[in-house]
Regions:
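Non-heme Fe(II)-dependent double-stranded beta-helix
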Residues: 2-17, 23-117, 122-125, 273-274
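Short, structured patches in soluble enzyme cores that scaffold and shape functional sites
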Residues: 119, 136-140, 149-151
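Non-heme Fe(II)/2-oxoglutarate
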Residues: 44-48, 55, 214-219, 223-300
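Short, solvent-exposed loop/turn segments at secondary-structure junctions
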Residues: 26-28, 104-105, 122, 140-141, ...
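Short, conserved beta-strand element in jelly-roll/cupin
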Residues: 125-143, 211-214, 219, 244-248
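Short, charged/polar surface micro-motifs in flexible loops or helix N-caps
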Residues: 93, 108-111, 140-143, 155, ...
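A short beta-loop-beta micro-motif enriched in histidine and acidic residues
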Residues: 118-131, 205, 212, 236-237
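Double-stranded beta-helix
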Residues: 143-225
Length: 300
């Protein structure tokens, strides 16, 4: 196996806390394959890629790349890795599937590109216990710049996504309106002002965060509230690949079409491309259905 050790395990803190870290999971050859996947996605963006440049600060995000080459590179990167066994063990799941990728680029010298505290499940139709994001950085991340998790919030309610101004996060007047609002029936409750509350009371939540080196992986449930991970003077660039997996206890939760920064035209173009490139017709899922489909790569 192209991995530094075959005895690596995912700590059960993934289940109780919502996030954990696995040190030295990937060796050099595996990282090279994962970086090839990242680089290809970066060079071949989807219609929903989001890019922002402000002076020397740059932010880029893209996901759900349906190009056939992405599938090929993904299968090459995951081949012979024990990720399926690791997740099956911690979840007690008979099966494990690979869902999709997401890529990030953050460049800043001023610590001004913190990610808003949010749940991925506020923007994606995922429900259930058996979901995991593998957050893989190709650049060293110091402790002060790690992704931050509010411990145990994956066991709590579903919040609506509420954007804020990352340059002035404690200013309530600069918070946006709930993203979905009445488009959800019934509407989800608006997310608390996590940043503002933590500024006033740093003990309001236990915060989990880890500095990482290339080869380390932060593993978390997409329902856990997370954010942060700014770049700055000592750490001006971060290239991150997030790989998503699911197991037996994974379900469909309907949400309105679209997403942060997406126009209706962008969303429709993504759906068109996915249908055009699909090798098999995806299954139609209803609320509460098991999350399944022939397009997902089974790794256990």
């Amino acid at each position: 196996m192209s991995i530094t050790a075959t005895s690596k395990k995912i700590d059960k803190a993934l289940l109780t806390d919502g996030a954990t870290v696995v040190r030295g999971l990937f060796d050099g050859p595996t990282l090279a394959k994962l970086l090839a996947l990242y680089d290809y996605c970066f060079a071949n963006p989807t219609p929903i890629a989001l890019s922002s440049v402000k002076g020397e600060d740059r932010s880029y995000t893209d996901m759900l790349n349906s190009h056939p080459k992405v599938r090929e590179l993904t299968e090459q990167a995951l081949e012979n890795l024990p990720i399926g066994e690791m997740l099956a063990e911690v979840w007690d799941s008979e099966h494990v599937w690979y869902l999709t990728e997401e890529i990030f680029l953050r460049e800043s010298k001023g610590n001004k590109n913190r990610g808003v505290f949010h749940q991925d499940t506020s923007l994606a139709p995922w429900d259930g216990e058996h979901w995991a994001n593998f957050w893989i950085s190709f650049d060293p991340v110091p402790d002060d710049n790690g992704l931050e998790f509010l411990k145990g919030t994956h066991l709590g309610p579903q919040y609506d996504y509420v954007p804020y101004d990352p340059e002035d996060p404690s200013n309530q007047s600069k918070r946006g309106k709930p993203f979905w609002g009445d488009k959800n029936d019934p509407p989800w409750q608006a997310a608390p002002d996590f940043e503002g509350i933590l500024v006033k009371d740093p003990t309001a939540w236990d915060i989990l965060s880890w500095g990482v080196e290339p080869g380390d992986v932060v593993v978390f449930h997409p329902h856990v509230v997370h954010g942060g991970a700014p770049t700055g003077p000592r750490y001006p660039r971060r290239r991150t690949l997030s790989l998503r997996f699911f197991g037996d206890k994974s379900y469909f939760k309907p949400i309105p079409p679209g997403g942060v920064g997406q126009t209706e035209e962008m969303h429709e173009e993504r759906i068109r491309l996915e249908k055009e490139r699909a090798t098999e017709e995806p299954l139609e899922m209803q609320a509460g259905d098991l999350w399944r489909g022939p397009q997902y790569l089974q790794i256990r």
